[in-house]
Amino acid sequence: MSVLRVGNASGFYGDRFSALREMLTGGPLDVLTGDYLAELTMLILGRDRLKNPDAGYARTFLRQLEECLGLAHERGVRIVTNAGGLNPAGLADAVRALADRLGIPVRVAHVEGDDLTAAHPGTLAAHAYLGGFGIAACLRAGADVVVTGRVTDAALVTGPAAAHFGWEPTEYDRLAGAVVAGHLLECGTQATGGNYAFFRDGDVRRPGFPLAELHADGTSVLTKHDGTGGFVDVGTVTAQLLYETGGARYAGPDVTARLDTVRLTQDGPDRVRVEGVRGEAPPPTLKVGLNRLGGFRNEVAFVLTGLDVEAKAALVRHQMEPALAKVSDVRWDLARTDRPDAATEETASALLRLVVRDADQEAVGRALSGAAIELALASYPGFHVLAPPGKGAPYGVFEAAHVPQETVDHVAVLHDGRRVPVPAARDTAVLRAVPEPPLPEPLPPGPVRRAPLGLVAGARSGDKGGDANVGVWARTDDAWRWLAHELTGDRFRELIPEARDLTVTRHPLPNLRALNFVVEGILGEGVAAQARFDPQAKALGEWLRARHLDIPEALL
């Protein structure tokens, strides 16, 4: 059967607006996907829906489509997107209205059944992560545009692949190959040099969006349109493969993909072949993302310049205590960004960050603002803040739950209005950790030099609820022989003191020369709670790469 060319034009709600047009005009495609839904996005859309029950979807997609629907129709490119968010039926209707207004004859279908909010009182949005077979049913029935709500990110690719190649639900290896391709595409330009540890290896000023050439056996080639920016090599693909994953088993509603079986090889300039992926029966449950409003938060950053930084911090904390007495959650963080004998005022300054959270907006609003501003002439020398605190703003909390697959009514609503139930997975297997794989022989002893880890290893980090993952990979076999034995869980805690009292699980992936670390609870209640300086752990991997270890000189 022919190769299926699937592109991506969005990695998040707010991604490059012109990407849809760029992908349609840049070269041949069969399907163009757009991923708009992050954990935080569901909360944002939930708040939109509170104001307007007809809202709840990614409105940017409609504006993009107004420019590009005719182009997609002319070129025969089908569009599959999760921009439906909390209201896929509403977005599907809006796309039909747009097509009618533009005079473009397109068939629009949508997928529903993910919304479980009614079964979870107190949540703003509760949505199950559906698989790709609802999308496949829509495409097999002739849809040109398929709109979904919450599906797994990879489902945007497994659905088109299953429809095109006629895969059955039990063809696990092929489905797993498509899951890996979907995971590589889902974050857009992160696969083509964006946010890449070794970004200086290519021109990443404006990376092109990725596409995958999928084959009937589940193998694929990750690439991009000719003439676009960025670059695709084994490193950029490895980085994205490790992003926001956990152990060797990468579970989804349709299949569990074994990341410890993935083989990546350079297949020419800007082409990486992905093969060897094994799949297993999916778990018996579906993940459900629960978003709720947690209360109100506020923050202020005091600037401490010059000498006596610790004493200045102690003074302002003492002065703020009366205003904070009734606040339920108070967090102080002192960032010693100051340097001795600094040449600029900025580099002579440290930042003392105060974050407060409470169910009562007033407790973290005017009371905090007034107390901080009243210190302007009555505190430490050089007193000032980065910005005056405002009124308390609402914050969200994300939690993950699981429900039996068969309790979720996954439905494909075809372009002609017919409703097709999508059965739950027939065979399932409880998710279990894989045994520790054999590691390579350590490097022989030799001279070492104190140097940053990032000189010999790349990293990419991200968030899953309150947890963070940090994927670390070596670029050479010898570097892997050293990394596999040096960067243990205990050494990770030493290098990242913030994780010292947290559960850190190390998952070796020798096929990728990589280690994946999962740090439980480091992000508190998730990104929307903004409890941490870097609430999505985006730079946690870069912090790790900047830490110094004794590295064999032969690797440097």
Which sequence ranges carry the predicted segments?
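Conserved phosphate/anionic-ligand binding catalytic regions in large, soluble enzymes, centered on
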Residues: 82-86, 143-160, 459-478
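Gly-rich Lys/Arg/Thr-decorated short loops/hinges at beta-loop-alpha junctions or inter-strand turns
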Residues: 1-3, 37-55, 73-75, 114-122
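N-terminal amphipathic/basic leader segments beginning at the initiator methionine
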Residues: 1-22
